[in-house]
């Protein structure tokens, strides 16, 4: 019986490349000349630091573009409501999540069941397994999830026929 897994994973190497590319572009940007600005990575957390809150937002946009070039969705990152302010620096810490948390997994299963596609979806830890009799049904589920308004970036892997 064909099946596949729905997961949400961030490749740390690709994230590091995105940070390095954003830092490289930061060093050439005219609006950041003479300003202390940096993008640093610690595991799945990325910290953006600069001297004003407006520049932090610009830095966030710059980093988001670098992430998209590496096929990482920055929308899946946890971002605090307010910027951290200490001394003369403002900082923003983006924390990327690994795996699908329980409420999102339940939302995915509910969405699949409401679509009336003849497949079974089950939550297995931090991923969702989808089983069906036909490959076409599984591909319909993939298309449905790509078009859905789920905040978490999803990947499909372990496709078995």
From Swiss-Prot:
Pfam families: DUF520. GO terms for molecular function: nucleotide binding. Keywords: Nucleotide-binding. The keyword Nucleotide-binding applies. InterPro entries: DUF520, UPF0234-like_C, UPF0234_N, YajQ-like_sf. Belongs to the YajQ family. HAMAP family: YajQ. Nucleotide-binding protein. This is Nucleotide-binding protein ABO_0048.
């Amino acid at each position: 019986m064909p099946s596949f897994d729905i997961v949400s994973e961030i490749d740390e190497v690709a994230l590091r490349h995105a940070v390095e590319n954003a830092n490289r572009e930061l060093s050439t940007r005219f609006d950041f000349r003479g300003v202390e600005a940096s993008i640093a990575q610690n595991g799945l957390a990325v910290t953006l630091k600069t001297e004003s809150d407006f520049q932090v937002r610009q830095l966030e946009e710059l980093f988001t573009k670098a992430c998209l070039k590496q096929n990482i969705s920055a929308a899946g990152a946890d971002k605090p409501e307010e910027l951290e302010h200490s001394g003369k620096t403002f900082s923003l810490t983006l924390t990327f999540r690994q795996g699908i948390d329980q409420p999102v997994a339940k939302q995915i299963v509910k969405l699949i069941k409401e679509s009336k596609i003849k497949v079974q979806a089950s939550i297995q830890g931090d991923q969702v397994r989808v089983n069906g009799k036909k490959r076409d049904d599984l591909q319909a589920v993939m298309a449905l999830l790509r078009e859905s308004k789920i905040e978490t970036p999803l990947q499909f892997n372990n496709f078995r026929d």
